[in-house]
């Protein structure tokens, strides 16, 4: 069963999709250029613009930068029972043993942006495959509440409730037949 979707204005044609995509790309490009001019920094190349007179960028040591802004290596933590963990960390393509603390350009305040190599590209390793994938089923309302079915002890062709008497000893109903009942 497919998920429900709402299409308020009808399905777009391929031409409308391409026009929308072009419009969005132009808007993003315009916004990037405005921000680049505003801050004097090329965010795509991650370098300062040469003509930026308003800002002076300088390299600072890593220990002077707050922890929030430091580059970190991400690890994935999972339980061993559900996944086969072989290696789930991110590593740079250049060398897996390089860490940010050992990198000389981060520690050397005299280095410039031009001396840097191209930025490292991070390679995501394949996520571990689950050993057993549980099948999802659509839950029912009765899964969330207790359901008790009421027994209908008196059907239309049985005796009326007037003839059912509860005795104090057994707590079971005693059913009298019409022949044994007195009218009074």
Curated annotation (Swiss-Prot):
* Protein task: Negative cell-cycle regulator that functions at the G1-to-S-phase transition. Required for suspension of the cell cycle in dauer larvae and starved L1 larvae. In vulval precursor cells (VPCs), a pathway of heterochronic genes acts via cki-1 to maintain VPCs in G1 during the L2 larval stage. Cul-2 may function in ubiquitin-mediated degradation by targeting cki-1 for degradation. Involved in distal tip cell development by repressing and modulating cye-1/cdk-2 activity levels in Z1.aa/Z4.pp and in Z1.ap/Z4.pa.
How is the subunit organization of this protein annotated in UniProt? Answer: Interacts with cyd-1; the interaction is direct.
Q: What is this protein called?
A: Cyclin-dependent kinase inhibitor 1
Q: In which tissues is it expressed?
A: In embryos, expression is first seen in pharyngeal primordium and later in all differentiating cells. Post embryonic expression corresponds to developmental patterns of cell cycle progression in many tissues including sex myoblasts, distal tip cells, vulval cells, seam cells, neurons, intestine cells and hypodermal cells.
> Where, subcellularly, is it found?
Nucleus
Its taxonomic path starts at: Eukaryota, Metazoa, Ecdysozoa, Nematoda, Chromadorea
> Region labeled Disordered — which residues?
85-184
InterPro entries for this protein: CDI_dom, CDI_dom_sf
* Top-level lineage group: Eukaryota
| Recorded GO CC terms | nucleus
Biased-composition ranges, Low complexity, are 85-98
Q: Per the UniProt entry, what is one GO biological process?
A: positive regulation of G1 to G0 transition
What is the documented disruption phenotype for this protein? RNAi-mediated knockdown results in additional cell divisions in postembryonic intestinal cells characterized by a premature entry into S phase.
Please state which protein family the record places this protein in: Belongs to the CDI family.
Is Nucleus given among the entry's keywords?
Answer: yes
What keywords is this UniProt entry annotated with?
Answer: Cell cycle, Nucleus, Protein kinase inhibitor, Ubl conjugation pathway
**Which segments cross the bilayer?**
none
> Which Pfam families does the entry mention?
CDI (PF02234)
A GO molecular function for this record?
A: cyclin-dependent protein serine/threonine kinase inhibitor activity
């Amino acid at each position: 069963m497919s998920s429900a979707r709402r299409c308020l204005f009808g399905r777009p044609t391929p031409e409308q999709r391409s026009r929308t995509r072009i419009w969005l790309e132009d808007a993003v490009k315009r916004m990037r250029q405005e921000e680049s001019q505003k801050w004097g920094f090329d965010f795509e190349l991650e370098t300062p613009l040469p003509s930026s007179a308003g800002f002076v960028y300088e390299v600072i040591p890593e220990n002077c930068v707050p922890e929030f802004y430091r580059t970190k290596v991400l690890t994935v933590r999972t339980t061993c029972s559900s996944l086969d963990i072989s290696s789930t960390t991110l590593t740079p393509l250049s060398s897996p043993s390089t860490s940010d603390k050992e990198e000389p350009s981060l520690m050397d305040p005299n280095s410039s942006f031009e001396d840097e190599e191209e930025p490292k590209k991070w390679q995501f390793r394949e996520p571990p495959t689950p050993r057993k994938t549980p099948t999802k089923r659509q839950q029912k309302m009765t899964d969330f509440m207790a359901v008790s079915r009421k027994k209908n002890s008196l059907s239309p062709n049985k005796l009326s409730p007037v003839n059912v008497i509860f005795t104090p000893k057994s707590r079971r109903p005693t059913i009298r037949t019409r022949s044994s009942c007195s009218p009074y």
